[in-house]
Amino acid sequence: MPIRHCIVHLIEKKPDGTPAVLHARDSELAESQAIENMLADLNESYNAKQGKAWGLFHPESGAHPFSGWLKEYIDGGSDFTAFSRMAVEHLQKLMEESNLSVGGHVLFAHYQQGMTDYLAIALLHHSEGVAVNAELDVTPSRHLDLGQLHLAARINISEWQNNKQSKQYISFIKGKNGKKVSEYFRDFIGCQEGVDGPGETRTLLKAFSDFVESEDLPEESAREKTKTLVDYASSQSKMGEPMGLEELSELIDEERPRAFYDHIRNKDYGLSPEIPADKRTLNQFRRFTGRAEGLSISFEAHLLGDKIEYDESAGTLIIKGLPTQLTDQLKRR
């Protein structure tokens, strides 16, 4: 993962309305193994974070100047240090306007992954710990707590430049308890939500369920294809990459690589060719299966409490909305 440019600034700020104090670095960080390790750990933590949103830049304006500064830097009109300095001064101003915000170390990193350029921005904080020194004494130790990542964003520079129709070249962490804590950071980037990750993932899972039902697949085959979908989505999420519908279709059925993709297009589910995988939604998508004495039951977990009701004390399942194929068979019995 080549790191093209990296710099860290410090903003001191308490959530009590006091002015934010900026300590800006004057030059980029020199290449080192420590920086490579930090960025690798940051990416791993960011990719694993649930509750991210995807979007695109607002049109450049006085309220949203970040994209203009980034374009100027990419086009060679300013260097990385100057770009980061303008950006962090803007962030300082927004922090002062938000009583909920706290300061921290602001990381800007321009790096490549494969053939793609990214810009990562994160507000980092220290944690207190302990270490054992060369004399075997236990001593206090401070370290960047990359596991507790609350405010961060990643911009796919390549997609932003080359795909003018894209609405998901920015990803950012949304606030857990309401939006207010993270609103100023989203405004700093100048980002508007363009893709509903959880909603798109739910629609994909609905399309897959419909596909399995329309294909009348044996239970074992349906279970294997479900596992393929979940494994692929989880893998893409871990890498911070979107799911490609054509690629997923090829994995689901190697003999008919376009079958699932054509099902999605023909039924007009309204899915984009690439969609972000929402981990929380995926975790709800697993199958309950059981077989005994000529009876075989298999259904997806998200149907429990909706189309399927389970009475534990009576040991019964109530199924609503039976498949038409099954009801037709029952009528002809």
UniProtKB/Swiss-Prot annotation:
Positions of transmembrane segments: none
Primary location class: cytoplasm
Keywords associated with the record: Cytoplasm
Cellular component, GO, one term: bacterial nucleoid
Location(s), subcellular: Cytoplasm, Nucleoid
Similarity annotation: Belongs to the YejK family.
Name of this chain's protein: Nucleoid-associated protein Psyr_1083
Species of provenance: Pseudomonas syringae pv. syringae (strain B728a)
